[in-house]
Amino acid sequence: MHELGVVFHIIDSLEEVAKENDVTQIQSVTIEIGEVSTVIPHYLTDCWEWAIKKKPMLTGCAMKVEILPAITWCDGCKQEYPTVQHGRICPYCGSEKTWLLKGNELNIKEVEVL
């Protein structure tokens, strides 16, 4: 389960931002997860609930998760299409010359402080 490592990285980033901005308590964090990333949202939130117990600055901090749709670009016909629905082969022209544009990311979108 690599979600725990992801949570530790998120916590490190939050601690760094809090220190730079003289923040002592974080109320919530919003995370964007691409729908074809390898991060499983409910594993991430379970790990989050466990990990924040060890960080006073994050006591009671809620993690909000937003899923970003995966979009693929076709080099053959120059169109975008939904990756999960159609896979790697372009539904417009049948080309296999396709590239994932978005949907594999994991971002800290927003941090709410007290």
Language-model segments: residues:
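Short metal-binding segments enriched for Cys and/or His
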Residues: 98-110
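Flexible glycine-/small-residue-rich
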Residues: 33, 67, 110
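Cys/His-enriched microdomains
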Residues: 72, 88, 106
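Short acidic/polar capping segments at secondary-structure boundaries
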Residues: 112-114
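Short cysteine-rich clusters marking metal-coordination/redox-active sites
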Residues: 74-77, 90-93
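Long, charged N-terminal interaction/targeting segments
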Residues: 1-64
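Short, flexible, mixed-charge glycine/proline-rich loop motifs
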Residues: 62-69, 79-84
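Short functional micro-motifs and their immediate structural scaffolds
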Residues: 82, 95-99
